[in-house]
């Protein structure tokens, strides 16, 4: 492998932020303007957060290059002329609702195995094709993340002749193409042709070319069977002629063809490509096409709740679902981390991710006295790339505290509690308060989705039905009197709940259950003392006395 093509060469040494090191390597190649940053995907199942890896890595490198005064074009190719080789178990509609294959027109897919994605009817009936449906979801996800990326359809590029020149060149130099591919792939014999026509009779992609007329720009073919994993997609046997716009290049040739056609200067990709099609692609690019490959960057895949994303199986989370849980800058923060390290996107522990972002924000604004020099330098470099506008007056309510506020639907009470606990400054204006409280609904959704200790609703409107024995009623009255006379913090109130139960010889668990019944209409709930200490005193005392 040429030393410039090592995808692991960019170790980020000497740079606080990996995107700066990546931009350095891109500029070392003296690229023409605009600098082209690319990613790509083949349609499959449900587009999810993991599919945003290349888009978001490219976003940061593009931002750094623009900071340095360069014009950048960020593109994302949909390999939508690929043939459908199997049926996904899950799909997503344009609203991001994930459904089983049986809930839509499954026949649209099942009857078109072997056909290009853009020739398959949309199972939802809303887009021009299944390929277009998938691309629309990717574009929508990028838009939600605030990334200005241009979707490029391979089908359209073939149809408008964008790949015609490079395809013709490969067919004219087929011996060299075979020799290079044979270093990476078995079954490359003297009859191999790097072009897969689309059968004019059945519409399937076929791999059997019987004759080439490069001058005329046509191939002769036979529609034969296609191996697709553990199944065989039958060809129809038709013999026909196809132009170079009526088929596709095999992937190992299509990738370097994209680099040439789009003028790609930089492309991040997963380690599966780094150890597979990247070495062959650079070899084809340099030694068959005579091109300089783009600057590479390999990234580690991240998992979802400890397990690999699976689009077809539905183990995914969509971008719109993530943004119902997290503010956009927090999502960008996740992707700003070192791409060479494997990570887990843990929904259960999203509070930790938010806390990390909040910490960086405080460090940036000089509000973390214990910050190290490295922390301060990294925050100064990265934070401005995470937010759309830098606002020193912005208020962030701690995520788990926001989840506590989410236990009540009363917006005025949410603000009152947040102010009382010091999470909203006394001089905050209405817009600042409203912005700060948007985190509450996200934290509430996190609690609901994970069913954690914050997934409760305060029964404030009216007292829930209850039936307490005399000892429990007396202990509750005693607790109300304690609150009338004292001003305890959460832990002191928690301790008094224990003591009241003991004084009246009540089972501790049963007494807490009585409190949960009064305040949540549940038998269990959050840590009761700290929660009640955050509420207005009059309401808590009245409820403990069962008066409203």
From Swiss-Prot:
Q: Name one GO cellular component term.
A: cytoplasm
- Answer yes or no on keyword ATP-binding: yes
Keyword terms, alphabetized: Aminoacyl-tRNA synthetase, ATP-binding, Cytoplasm, Ligase, Nucleotide-binding, Protein biosynthesis
EC class name: ligase
Give any GO molecular function from the UniProt entry: tRNA binding
Q: Does the record bear Cell cycle in its keywords?
A: no
**Entry's Pfam families?**
tRNA-synt_1f
This entry's Enzyme Commission designation comes to 6.1.1.6
Q: Which GO terms describe its biological process?
A: lysyl-tRNA aminoacylation
Compartments where found: Cytoplasm
* Broad class of where this protein is predominantly found: cytoplasm
Question: What residue intervals hold the motif 'KMSKS' region?
Answer: 308-312
Q: Where does the source fall among the domains of life? A: Archaea
Q: Which PROSITE patterns match?
A: AA_TRNA_LIGASE_I
Locate the motif 'HIGH' region. 43-51
The record's catalysed reaction(s) read: tRNA(Lys) + L-lysine + ATP = L-lysyl-tRNA(Lys) + AMP + diphosphate
Q: By its UniProt entry, which InterPro entries does this protein fall under?
A: aa-tRNA-synth_I_codon-bd_sub2 (IPR020751), aa-tRNA-synth_I_CS (IPR001412), aa_tRNA-synth_I_cd-bd_sf (IPR008925), Lys-tRNA-ligase (IPR002904), Rossmann-like_a/b/a_fold (IPR014729)
NCBIfam families, per the entry:
lysS_arch (TIGR00467)
* Family as reported in the entry's similarity comment: Belongs to the class-I aminoacyl-tRNA synthetase family.
Supply the name of the protein: Lysine--tRNA ligase
Per the UniProt record, the lineage of the source organism begins with: Archaea, Methanobacteriati, Methanobacteriota, Stenosarchaea group, Halobacteria
């Amino acid at each position: 492998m040429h030393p410039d093509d090592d995808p692991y060469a960019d170790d980020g040494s000497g740079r606080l932020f990996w995107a700066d090191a990546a931009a350095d390597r891109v500029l070392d190649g003296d690229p023409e303007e605009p600098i082209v940053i690319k990613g790509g995907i083949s349609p499959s199942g449900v587009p999810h957060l993991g599919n945003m890896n290349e888009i978001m890595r490219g976003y940061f490198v593009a931002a750094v290059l623009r900071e340095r005064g360069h014009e950048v074009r960020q593109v994302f190719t949909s390999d939508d002329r690929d043939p459908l080789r199997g049926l996904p178990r899950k799909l997503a509609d344009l609203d991001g609702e994930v459904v089983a294959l049986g809930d839509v027109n499954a026949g649209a897919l099942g009857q078109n195995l072997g056909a290009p994605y853009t020739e398959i009817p949309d199972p939802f009936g809303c887009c021009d094709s299944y390929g277009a449906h998938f691309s629309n979801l990717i574009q929508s996800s990028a838009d939600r993340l605030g990334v200005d990326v241009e979707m490029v359809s391979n089908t359209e590029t073939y149809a408008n002749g964008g790949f015609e020149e490079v395809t013709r060149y490969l067919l004219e130099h087929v011996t060299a193409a075979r020799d290079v591919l044979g270093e990476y792939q078995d079954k490359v014999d003297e009859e191999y042709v790097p072009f897969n026509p689309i059968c004019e009779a059945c519409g399937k992609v076929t791999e059997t070319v019987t004759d080439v007329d490069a001058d005329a720009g046509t191939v002769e073919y036979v529609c034969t069977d296609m191996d697709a994993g553990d199944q065989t997609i039958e060809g129809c046997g038709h013999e026909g002629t196809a132009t170079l716009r009526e088929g596709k290049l095999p992937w190992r040739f299509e990738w370097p063809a994209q680099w040439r056609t789009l003028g790609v200067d930089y492309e991040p990709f997963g380690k599966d490509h780094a150890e597979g099609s990247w070495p062959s692609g650079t070899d084809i690019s340099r030694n068959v096409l005579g091109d300089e490959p783009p600057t590479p960057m390999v990234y580690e895949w991240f998992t979802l709740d400890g397990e690999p994303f699976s689009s077809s199986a539905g183990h995914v989370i969509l971008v719109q679902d993530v943004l119902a849980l997290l503010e956009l800058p927090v999502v960008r923060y996740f992707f700003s981390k070192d791409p060479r390290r494997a990570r887990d996107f843990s929904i259960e522990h999203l509070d930790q991710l938010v806390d990390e972002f909040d910490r960086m924000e405080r460090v940036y604004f000089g509000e973390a006295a214990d910050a190290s020099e490295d922390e301060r330098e990294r925050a100064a470099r990265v934070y401005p790339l995470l937010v759309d506008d830098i606002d020193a007056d912005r208020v962030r309510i701690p995520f788990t505290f926001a989840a506590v506020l989410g236990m009540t639907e009363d917006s005025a009470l949410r603000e009152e509690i947040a102010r009382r606990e010091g999470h909203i400054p006394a001089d905050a204006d209405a817009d600042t308060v409203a912005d700060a409280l948007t985190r509450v609904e996200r934290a509430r959704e996190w609690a609901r989705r994970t069913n954690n200790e914050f997934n409760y609703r305060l029964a404030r409107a009216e007292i829930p039905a209850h039936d307490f024995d005399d000892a429990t009623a007396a202990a509750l009255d005693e607790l109300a009197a304690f609150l009338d006379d004292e001003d305890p913090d959460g832990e002191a109130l928690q301790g008094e709940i224990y003591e009241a139960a003991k004084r009246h010889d009540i089972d501790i668990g049963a007494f807490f259950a009585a409190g949960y019944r009064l305040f949540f209409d549940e038998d269990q709930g959050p840590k009761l003392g700290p929660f009640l200490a955050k509420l207005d005193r009059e309401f808590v005392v009245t409820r403990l006395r069962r008066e409203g």
